[in-house]
Amino acid sequence: PRMMRTTLHSSSSLRTRWRKTSNAIMLALTGLAVLIAIVPLFWILAQVFLAGVSALNLDFFTQLPTPAGVPGGGIANALVGSIITVGLGLLIALPIGLLTGFYTATHSNRPLGLAVRFGTDVVAGVPSIVMGLFVYALIVLPQHHFSAWSGGVALAFIMLPIIIRTTEEMIRLVPSSMREGSLALGAPEWKTSLRVVLPAAWNGVLTGVMLAAARAAGEAAPMLFTAFGNPFMSTDISQPIVTLPQTVFVYAISPYPDWQAKAWASALVLIFLVLFLNVTARLIVAW
């Protein structure tokens, strides 16, 4: 019996040591994976910040670009262009996305609902440059010129899947008792959706809209095929317009050191803009 107790105690100690060792190994591997994911991100952010912060000043945000080789100037036209194109995209994508999300949430088992959900997932995986080419063939070629509103349409296609899926998920999270109570009181279905369901899901829906806007604000490829670019200040949606991602692209590939410095600064501004939209979305969820 004493030998049996000694053997059992020894095997129990071995199992305990093995569990502690395996736990330490897994914690180390998990920490290494986190470092591999985080270090490149902070490296990129630090590089962009160090290379771009020196070019930031008041003129950079308020002045128009200068010709190649001429120092000074800014990205005021690109800031305005980004606001216009993202705003146009939201005007198009928001009502369509909300209504489609409502339909797929409330009619998820119908053939049309299943088809819409499948199509949304497919569109979400399409590269943004393909969206730009599609809008180029759909709008730009028939009109024979680039325009801000064609860029807004391209961004709307990019934002739609995000808004649709977010709206659908948020509507599904609303307790069915709220809808049933409103219908039991005699409210029509459209009024129930508008006055009861949507307010209950609005914080989550707004988060999806903010994330969609953040995604669209960083797109350069579709803008090259639709809005094209403009070195001047323009608020005419029927004319070409420039955005921040386009500015980063054009300045970065130029051989002029001043433009390359502005490319880093523009990238820094774009990062802070996207970060602001993402943080705002998180705060909306927390609130």
Please provide the spans of the model-predicted regions.
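Periplasmic/extracellular loop-to-transmembrane helix junction in inner-membrane transport proteins
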Residues: 9-32, 46-89, 109, 250-261
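Interhelical loop and adjacent transmembrane-helix boundary motif
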Residues: 68-69, 223-271
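Transmembrane-helix boundary motif in ABC transporter permease subunits
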Residues: 89-120, 133, 281-287
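Glycine/proline-centered hinge or cleavage motifs at structural transition points of membrane proteins
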Residues: 127, 185-186, 199
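C-terminal transmembrane helix and the adjacent membrane-cytosol boundary/short C-terminal tail
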Residues: 168-172, 183, 210, 250-287
